[in-house]
Each structure stands twice: as C-alpha cells, then as structure tokens.
Amino acid sequence: MAKVKRDISYLNKDFGDFRNQLINFSKTYFPTTYTDFSPASPGMMFMEQASYVGDVLSFYLDNQLQETFIQYARQTNNLFDLAYMFGYTPKVTSLATTQLDIFQIVPAKTIGTGSLPDFSYALDFPENTEVTGDGQTFTIQDNIDFTVSSSQDPTLITVAQVNGATPTYYLLNKKRNATSGDIQTTTFSFGEHQEFPTVDLQGTSIAQILDVFDSDGNEWYQVSALGQDSVYDKIKNTNVNDPNNSNGEEDTPYILQLKQVQRRFATRFIDNTTLQIQFGSGNAEANDEEIIPNPHNVGLGLPYTQDKLTTAYSPTNFIFTNTYGIAPSNTTLTVRYITGGGVASNVAANTLTNVDTTNTTFIQPTLNASLAQYVFNSVAVNNAGAATGGADGDSTEELRQNTISSYGTQLRNVTADDYLVRTLSMPSNFGSISKAHVQKPLNANSNTTLEIYTLSYDLN
C-alpha cells in the first residue's frame, strides 16, 4: 500500500485552531472512518483533549521563548541568569553605612607637675566588632586601637573627671565607619577531587561573602570570574611592605598589591535567597597549569607558542594561563557572610548605642583589676548622624533596566553615561545610590573633569 502524504499545518497556536485543524484533517484523510463531529460525540472528546494539550504546549513554548529575552522575561531566576550573561550583578539588598563615635575613659598618670592619659588602660577592639540599636546590627570592619593616633586615625582626648584642678580621668574618642548587617557562618565539606564544584548558600538578604578559609587555614579569594587569577589585596603602607612609599603612610595608610591566587571562587545569585559559590577545576596534587608566557615565547608565531598580541588585556589576568583555580578536596570550608541591609537599616541618629565587647582586650595585660573593670565598663558608642545607603534589592523592572544599561558600557568609563552607570552599579556592600547625576563643572572649561551628584535612601 502506497504511503499517503499528509498535509500538516504547523501554524496553529490555540485551542480553536488545533480543534478545527483536527476536524479538517479527519474529514480529509478519513472521510468514511468517522463522520460524527457533534460536540457530544466520543471522537470530538479525543480531538478536544488533543487540542487542549496542544494549546498548553504552545503557550509553554511561547512563554519560554519570551523568558530568553531580557526585555520580556518575568521569572526571577531567568532574569538573574540573563543579568549575569549581560555582565550585571543583581542586587538582593544594599547595606547602610554610618560613622560611629567610640568612647572609653583611661586614668590619668602624673608626669612631673602635670598629668597625661595612662594608655596602658587603652582598649583594642578587633575587626568586625558589632554595634546594635533600633533592631539593627552594624559592623565595624576595622580594628580600633586607642593607643594609635595619626592624621588618618586621630585619637581625640578630653578631660573626663577632675579632682580640684587635677585631671583624674581622660576621655578617649575614635571615629569609625560601620556597615549594617549580621555576620553569619556556615561550613561546607568536600570529598574527592571534582572539577568546578558548586555549593549553595541559603538565606535572606545576603549582601556579601566576608571571607572563606579551609580546614588547613588557607584563605580562598573571591574573583569576578574563575579565569581571573589575580586580586588586589589591601596591605598596610609600612617600610617593610613598601620602602619606596612608606614616607606617605599618614596620607595613604593602605596600598594595593596585585596578588596571584590559585584558591579562588566566583559567586552568582540564583534567586533572591540563594547565592551559588563555584570553585575551579584544578587538583592541588597535580600540575595542570599552562606554561606562563614570557618574552621568549610570546608573539613568535611558531607552533605551540603563546600569541597574545591581539588580546585585550586585564590587569587581574594579564598572563592568560587558562587555569581556573584549585577545586577544594578532602577539606571543610568555613564561610563567613553578611546578611541584612535594606531600607530598614537606615537608622536615625543616636540609635546605635550598644557595642559587643566580647573580644575586646586591653593593650597591656597586667593592670589593676578593679580599675581595669571600671575602665572596661566605661565603653560607649553612638552614631551622631543617621545611617544612609540601605536599600532593598532590585525589583523585576529595576533588574531589567539596570541590566540593559550596564551591558552598553562594557565596564568602560568614557562618556558621562558610562560614569552614571558605574555609579549606580556600586557593589551593595558599600551602600546603594538612589539617584545620580553626572555633568561637566559649571565654572570650568576643562573637558577632562566630570562632577557626580548622588542621593541615597534614608529611613523613610
């Protein structure tokens, strides 16, 4: 029997089109097999069921096609994927910042006919000391050493108590910037070596990863992409670290140092509550790196040599060794991360008054116990100004528009609009810009200067 060629239409999109096409198909190719096309007939029941399935699949196909375009996508996870594809990092929260005054008293000691503060009773606050108030937690990322005073970090001294005309106690005051958010800790265990392993960090309002250490004490560094093999590391500007520039340590207390790291990871938000951490593919026990380029093998044009003459260079990955870092194996990683922020973190002035002194210590270990306790109890903290910069994460439409704007700049700063986009794309751990405006200075003829005006959210 000869095979009959069927005329099939692929243009049907909804229930009615599918139903009519099935009826016409049956009448054309099975004219005597089935002739009852009334609504109550069994044959129409099967045709309408098939039309129903076709309509659902057609809708699903159209919807999924829309979800592949940033202009039309509506599902959060698809918008996040598209944002990363276009080079924009979604914001799920932004942290507020404020300046704090930290106080303590120290006893006076007699020097000749006068008196000076006894700095042996000065306190040392470690990094990431927490301050609370009005239901919010703020973190002081820098340590506080009251014995150190410089133009960049002055210790203000005033008389706190007197006996007649003689000071008995002095009040020490330091200022520090604080960022909203709670520090959370979690661990992930890894077994045998696996290329590009991923782990998911679950939580609400995840702002940033603070640090990652393995069970051997090695630090893992966050990079924007696993192909980036170097990071900028902040180190103190001392004579040991940089003899050539240490004479300017008061104006420049820290310097940036380019550091090549093999233990690294990249992060991306899957949705508003899930941060995925991905590691590299290398095995710490195997040498799988490419030979680092040097002047003897770059640009010779010979087989199996490096040719980097037409490559766009990045200062954080200028050797292009095609390595993606080490994958953790047979270890446990401890991850500290910050959660919180949002508009609610823009607390009013004079509300951050409680400081955690659990890890606070005296500079000198041997002191009078009762006097030391009195000094320790004198610790106080306050924010003279309101916290600003806290904002909720990107809404669906904000995420869409920010992604489209960010893609056009390609991370460059050339035009005024480029600077505007870079300003609005500030990492969330530094706060959030609500509105920004870029223009040339009104009273300057220079074409090389731009002024940036910014506004941030307050509590209301």
What spans do the regions from the language model cover?
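Signature of Asx- and small-polar-rich beta-strand/turn repeats characteristic
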Residues: 1-460
